[in-house]
């Protein structure tokens, strides 16, 4: 039951983000697939969109050279909320906000 609802939540989240950025949608779709549909794991992966990606690995992988998140997200109001200090993702326990300072 939980799996089904988390799958629906993922689909809605990715669909909404598709409205703002096709590259972001593609990237999130990959993370969604790799996260094995686990909502809490996926939120932890999606959260640090600004400077690094930390998905339960023992070290942080710096993704800013591969995915210019700030250039993709900042023009949209959703992006500003995600990247701002104290934004939506930070409230979910993420590490976003480094570029939003």
Swiss-Prot record:
Q: Which GO terms describe its cellular component?
A: membrane
Keyword check for Transmembrane helix, yes or no: yes
- Keywords assigned by UniProt, alphabetized: Membrane, Transmembrane, Transmembrane helix
Q: Which domain of life is it from?
A: Eukaryota
Compartments where found: Membrane
The way this protein sits in the membrane is described as: Single-pass membrane protein
Q: What is this protein called?
A: Putative uncharacterized protein C32H8.15
Q: Which organism is it from?
A: Schizosaccharomyces pombe (strain 972 / ATCC 24843)
